[in-house]
Amino acid sequence: MTDIATRADHLEKLLGSPWDADNPAGFAAAVAADEREETAPAAEAVLDEFGLLAEFVPRALGGRLDRIDHMIELMRSVHRRDPALGLARAGQLLASVNVWTAGSPEQRRDAAELLLGNGRIACAFHELAHGNDIAGNEFAARRVGSGLRLHGRKESIANLDRADALVILARTDPADGPRAHSQLFLPADLLAPEQVRRLPRFRSVGMRGVRLGGMEVADLPVPDGVLLGAPGTGVETASRAFQVTRLALPAMSTALLDTALRVTLRHTRRRRLYGREAAAIPMVRTTLAEAFTDLLICEALSRSAARALHLCPESGSVHAPAVKYLVAGVLTDAVQRLATVMGSEFYRRDGEHAVFQKIVRDVRPVGFGHIARAACLSALLPQLPGLLGRARRAPAPAPDALFTTEAELAEPDLPGLRLVAGGRDPLAGSLGTVLDEDLPTAARPLVEEHVRGFVALCEAGAALRPRELSITAEVPVRELAARYTVSLAAAACLGVRRTAPAGDFLARPEWLRAALTRLAGMERAIPTDLPPGVEDAMVEELLDRDDHGLSFGLTGRPYA
């Protein structure tokens, strides 16, 4: 199965219709497993049969990973049924991407062999005392003779109890600084019970099926060969490797909004109020149209950013935090608005709508898991003046391959990912040229509004001083970074519309007008209503896809 469409279709068929109450990999099974704070065993077995973890292994090592955007799209088939199941499997990417980025040939082969055999690799980076500040981590690896001795605590490790190996961030220099930490890749059987105490599992409100465990290590000897990359490069490696995951994990999570929309439609199209379908009530139609638009916005930005990792990998340090910040926020808000439409049905834990309350809980960690949205703005700020300055001085159209339905891309060069973009961002740079394109007449005023907003953002960025761009940046400065993410999303939507095949829904001006209207409201922090004709077109497309069992995302591919 080399073709992504074939693989995605095969996985959908293996997992079956999520609405089938007797399907052991369906919504009912996912909700029942969630009540037990686990994932459905039958669904786990299907993913093992499919060899899902091969999607995270580069083709050069025997896996299927050659396109990050394809990996994301396939994983949406898992996330849409059970986000916890999706995250538990995607957690292997958190660990393995560090191995692909900095590991020796032998370490890469070992990691690939594990994953291709359905083994698990846990990622042990964060510590509760330091949150997103991994440079402050205290878990230590001290050199003793020809080996290392590990000491410290890691309290929140996903699926530690099922791990065959771990990637650990450890302090190898007691002095603070950028070279104070290293990464370790070690087999789980080195965790001798005499020196390793397993900590109680953390219980969570959302993603309850993801088993969060911890360990307290005291003077554990490990061989020097467990070092992953050069000593002292642990934080640098993570900063480069996690560009993939900070982009990919929120992008996979658009499937949560797809399911929330699907459940809301199932409820409102069957329920009658005031002599008509509840779905026909104006407030309900508006909410459905806006949520559908938000889903397309999120996928436009995340697909463009994922492809940019192939085409212009230096932009990953910008696009990854931008995607995490905007997509996580939009998804959470959209699901909450749909909950108001569901009314008392949204918190039911039984019946065919029970998966909705699970989605409401599971979407929240998208905003703070792995890295918090606030930390994403902090990551963007130091690069903002350079990005805005270059976009203003040297605007250029973005490559079509960022947006088109089909694009030929080279395999990602993960070791080549960089810490900074050097001011290069093809999405931002394209906003200075979009008014020269053949735009739909009805959409041009909205495009002009976004271009004016970006010009104003560039002017504000030029006035920023280095001391304003630190972790203690004032709220107005942080808002500039938030506005930058909105501009990137607008550029992505414009590119998707421009390159869409003639006759395709994404080539129509209505969805572009809807997207730019929603984004303008986000930038001003004042929601703007969709024009009536635009709202009607969005609802019509949404209902048609619902009738034909198609994805609500950019691909519109068939779902089981």
Where are these regions (language model features)?
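A short, Trp-centered hydrophobic/proline-enriched beta-strand micro-motif
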Residues: 55, 117-126
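Glycine-rich beta->alpha junctions and the first turn(s) of the following alpha-helix
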Residues: 204-294, 402-488, 492
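N-terminal glycine-rich flavin-associated loop
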Residues: 86-106, 131, 147, 269
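A short core secondary-structure module
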Residues: 153-197
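Secondary-structure edge/capping motif, primarily at the C-terminal ends of alpha-helices
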Residues: 268-275, 302-312, 341, 438, ...
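Amphipathic, small/basic residue-rich leader segments at the start of a protein or domain
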Residues: 1-90, 110, 417-472, 481, ...
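A structural signal for short hydrophobic beta-strand segments in well-ordered beta-sheet cores
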Residues: 140-141
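Extended amphipathic alpha-helical segments with heptad-repeat/coiled-coil character used for oligomerization
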Residues: 305-399
